[in-house]
Amino acid sequence: MKVKFTMLVTAMIVLSLGTLHAQTPSKPAGGFDRLKVLAGEWQGTDESGKPVTSTFRLVSNDTALEETFQSDKDKEMVTMYTPDGSRVALTHYCSKGNQPKMESPAVTATADEFAFTFTGATNLASPEDTHLHHLVLQIDDAEHFTETWTIHEKGHDTKRVFKFTRRK
């Protein structure tokens, strides 16, 4: 009887430890940790010198990075960056009403360039409809970063470059 009771207690302890481990959130990918340095407010210009702003903030217990982008040309847009194993994934909530999804290759905590490639979209009637198809985010230094967008429309790609400086 004592042996059965001891085995039962041991099994319960082992099972509870497994449950405890399963509830512990996994550590975000190193590349995602690097993106966290962007938290804050940024002022920038597009390739023609027109003003743009971007605000980054950590949300969901620091497991997602929200970017809110505003230009004179476009209505406000939001991009959510999240860890996906050793990669970083994003969903761009475009002012056109579609939501392109992209992913970077595996990146490390010391990476300064994140090249996101299109993996799919929601609310995109046709792949030829206007949408953000690639995004390269380059962290130049603690006070500067650059975003290069590739917009795909009717079989043609157009690049837009935005250079940002941290607001003080």
Language-model features: where?
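Polar low-complexity intrinsically disordered regions
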Residues: 1, 19-21
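Bacterial N-terminal signal peptides that target proteins for export
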Residues: 1-9
